[in-house]
């Protein structure tokens, strides 16, 4: 609901977040994993319900509690749910009746116990006392409950339970109300500077948004796009926006989202993207708004490996000085940092974190808690194992707006997030390493291996499909539990990273198997290297993604290539969304689309003659005008075959994309397009690779994109399983598993040409299949005027186009 200015300001914080934030201390140490994993949370929820159910009639489970602290400017609401409160209901009714009759509660006899349950995989019997933040959480509930019913004292019971063995260890302590009140008031006094900061910052932010205007002159169709995005947000809908290159989609989504926040239709914006270059564009866009007076705070979250100060990441106090004592220093560092500016990118965050001797990555995450705009990779919202739990804890829906850039990438990314592979050889490897560290550990891994061996013997052909994997899940659960016990010992040894990787793979498998639905297929096969693998494969990620989208208020999926939109609507969400097609601002006369009808990359036609014909197409196209061209191939192998037949002469330079190029090598490759030159540059690249999307070569830096083939993925077990799945669900499986993903790569590659209204260029689609109706149906509307050519007449057609452009300049 939209906020009104007249309402008294309210800040809410959960009891758990309050104590974990204010009372945290000590080191970062990732040598023991799993405490916050999805699987651990699910197992914890189950054990909670089990203990609560058998606790007796005086045990009241999941009791909501709330306490309001009133300050001059605002109310701070502290709320949560106690796992259990033990009391006699008749005694409570007596107190309530006496209160209504005006009888002092001091005359009532009433005792209560707050029960806080913590499920964990660690050995609970090894605890000598409760963990500080766990006890603090229970004490908060005890204070709130005691204050509500005027109790002079109350008991707190900490219940620790092992999630595997269900062993229980309890600690019980009595507190007077006076002691709890003093402790609680001290706790919230430590939080007050943070709540004051948030209230004051939001006031300044909202005032700045009210005055904020669109920072540019609207391009043709751009105002409509801005309006459509704004309307979808205030209606709390999902929007799919096909926004052609040059339509200004970044500012056209960010600006209306910011204005919606100013109107009270949201409170935090997540700008999500798969590529670093688009994150930088988003950052620069928020900087432009800042220059126009916007006072929102923006942080760009960088992957842990890319912001770690060490060559090898080891997040523990023995190996990293920034991990040691991190939590003792980080709160003050965050508070001071927030006063230094409004837009925080990787370099700014890193330098300040190093200066304050805290982990740059964890520091960045803490900064994000106080920012209005978060620019990050998809996985920080959609991946259940690495999502930002401070925002997306189980069951919490926030006032969040999701702007999903380059949304065409999310289908495959989501499939990867919600899928897992367990390799038989990895099981044996870990078993061999850990064989001397406990018989139970060795036995659990041997049982997993034995099950995989049975499937391996059955897998005589390409793959084996599975239905019932309950036994394997049980075996994996036991193995993960035993490995966790080993990790608790913090034994330094060789292959520690491999053990951790395997452990997290098991945890991923267990958490994903918990929510398996119709969108999954389970199979085993032999990988290219001959190893045998078990796959839990998410063929349709829409249900999983929708669960994540439900954590926010509204979502905008946008890209220059979201065609056919129904394909993306079906795979990215379950709700019925809106869809729009933003108008292209480019003059179609400045761009020519050619379709080559005499070649194909079909396997049945691959031959020296066909490779030579492709080379002739390329030679004829680039000889029509000196300039920079990119040629995109379906694979490195195909690229090498065509390269052999290329006409090499002094009037042209050919550069070739290598596999696994470093960042410096990529920069050097692209720098070739910036050079002043009198000859032609031809860059041979791979479709779907790093140079086929997300790069901006404007003006005459790129005048032609030549697409070799339809980009169809290679036939594989995954693709065939996808095809069978969609066929069985009433769709055309070939289109969903092969054609649409392939054509998306084609359109992305073609989009490298014509980046501004001043640009002129050609796109050549070299494959006869582009003339087939299924392929043409995926063409953007701007391609409707394509010209059909062969290798003989395409040079004349290209010459005519460039001649037309020259005549316009005269």
Regions found by a protein language model. Give the residues of each.
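Metal-dependent nuclease catalytic cores that hydrolyze phosphodiester bonds in DNA/RNA
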Residues: 1-95, 99-110
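A contiguous, basic/glycine-rich beta-loop/short-helix subdomain that forms a polymer-engagement track
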Residues: 349-369, 374, 385-392, 485-601, ...
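Conserved pre-motif I regulatory segment
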Residues: 200-242, 255
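Conserved helicase motor "Helicase C" RecA-like lobe of SF1/SF2 P-loop NTPases
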Residues: 634-658
């Amino acid at each position: 609901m939209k906020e009104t200015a007249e309402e008294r300001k309210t800040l809410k914080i959960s009891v758990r977040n309050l104590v974990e934030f204010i009372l945290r201390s000590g080191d970062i140490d990732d040598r023991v994993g799993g405490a916050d994993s999805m699987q651990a949370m699910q197992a914890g929820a189950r054990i909670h319900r089990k203990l609560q159910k058998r606790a007796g009639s005086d045990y009241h489970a999941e009791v909501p509690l709330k306490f309001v602290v009133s300050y001059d400017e605002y109310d701070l609401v502290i709320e949560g749910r106690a796992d259990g409160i033990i009391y006699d209901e008749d005694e409570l009714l007596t107190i309530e009746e006496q209160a209504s009759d005006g009888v002092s509660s001091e005359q009532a006899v009433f005792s209560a116990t707050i029960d806080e349950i913590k499920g964990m995989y660690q050995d609970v019997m090894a605890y000598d006392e409760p963990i500080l933040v766990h006890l603090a959480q229970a004490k908060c509930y005890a204070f709130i409950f005691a204050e509500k019913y005027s109790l002079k004292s109350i008991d707190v019971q900490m219940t620790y339970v092992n999630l595997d063995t269900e062993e229980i260890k309890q600690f019980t302590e009595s507190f007077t109300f006076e002691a709890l009140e003093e402790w609680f008031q001290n706790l919230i006094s430590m939080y007050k500077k943070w709540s004051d900061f948030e209230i004051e910052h939001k006031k300044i932010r909202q005032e700045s948004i009210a005055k904020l205007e669109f920072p540019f002159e609207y391009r043709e169709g751009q105002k409509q796009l801005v309006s459509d995005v704004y309307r979808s947000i205030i209606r709390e809908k999902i929007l799919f926006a096909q926004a052609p290159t040059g339509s200004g989609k970044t500012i056209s989504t960010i600006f209306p989202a910011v204005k919606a926040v100013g109107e009270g239709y949201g409170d935090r914006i997540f700008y999500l993207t798969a590529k670093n270059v688009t994150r930088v564009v988003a950052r620069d866009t928020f900087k432009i708004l800042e220059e126009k007076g916007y006072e929102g705070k923006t942080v760009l979250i960088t992957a842990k490996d890319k912001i770690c100060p060490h060559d090898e990441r080891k997040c523990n106090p023995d190996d990293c000085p920034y991990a040691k004592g991190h939590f003792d220093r980080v709160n003050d560092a965050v508070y001071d940092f927030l006063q230094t500016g409004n837009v925080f990118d990787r370099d700014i965050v890193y330098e300040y974190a190093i200066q304050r001797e805290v982990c740059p990555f964890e520091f960045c995450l803490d900064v994000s808690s106080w920012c209005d705009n978060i620019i990050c990779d998809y996985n920080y919202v959609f991946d259940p194992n690495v999502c930002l739990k401070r925002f997306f804890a189980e069951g919490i829906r926030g006032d969040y707006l999701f702007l999903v850039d380059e949304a065409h990438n999310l289908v495959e990314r989501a499939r990867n997030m919600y899928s897992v592979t367990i390799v038989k050889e990895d099981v044996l490897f870990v078993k061999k390493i850990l064989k001397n560290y406990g018989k139970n550990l060795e036995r659990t891994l041997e049982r997993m291996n034995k099950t995989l061996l049975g499937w391996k013997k059955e897998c005589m052909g390409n793959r084996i499909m599975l239905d019932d994997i309950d036994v394997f899940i049980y075996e994996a659960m036991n193995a993960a539990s035993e490995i966790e016990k080993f990790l608790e010992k913090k034994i330094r040894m060789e292959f520690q990273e491999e053990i951790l990787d395997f452990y997290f793979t098991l945890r991923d498998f267990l958490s994903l198997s918990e929510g398996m639905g119709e969108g999954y297929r389970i199979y085993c096969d032999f990988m290219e290297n001959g190893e045998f693998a078990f796959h839990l494969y998410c063929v349709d990620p829409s249900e999983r993604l929708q669960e994540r989208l439900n954590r926010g208020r509204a979502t905008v999926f946008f890209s220059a290539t979201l065609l056919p939109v129904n394909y993306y609507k079906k795979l990215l969400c379950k709700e019925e969304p809106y869809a729009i097609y933003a108008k292209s601002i480019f003059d179609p006369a400045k761009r020519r689309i050619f379709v080559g009808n005499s070649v194909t990359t079909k396997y049945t036609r691959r031959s020296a003659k066909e490779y030579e014909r492709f080379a002739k197409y390329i030679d004829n196209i680039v000889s029509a005008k000196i300039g920079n061209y990119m040629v995109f191939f379906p694979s490195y192998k195909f690229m090498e075959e065509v390269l052999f037949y290329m006409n090499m002469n002094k009037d042209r330079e050919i550069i070739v994309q290598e596999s696994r190029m470093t960042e410096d090598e990529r920069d050097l490759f692209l720098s070739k397009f910036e050079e002043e030159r009198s000859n032609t540059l031809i860059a041979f690249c791979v479709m779907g690779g790093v140079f086929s999307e997300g790069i901006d070569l404007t003006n005459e830096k790129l005048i032609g994109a030549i697409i070799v083939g339809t980009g169809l993925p290679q036939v594989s077990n995954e693709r065939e399983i996808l095809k069978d799945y969609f066929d069985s669900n009433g769709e055309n499986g070939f289109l969903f598993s092969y054609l649409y993903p392939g054509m998306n790569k084609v359109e992305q590659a073609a989009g490298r040409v014509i980046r501004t209204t001043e640009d002129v260029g050609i796109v050549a689609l070299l494959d006869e299949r582009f003339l087939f109706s299924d392929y043409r149906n995926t063409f953007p509307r701007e391609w409707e005027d394509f010209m059909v050519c062969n290798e003989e007449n395409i040079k004349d057609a290209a010459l005519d186009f460039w001649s037309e452009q020259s005549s316009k300049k005269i």
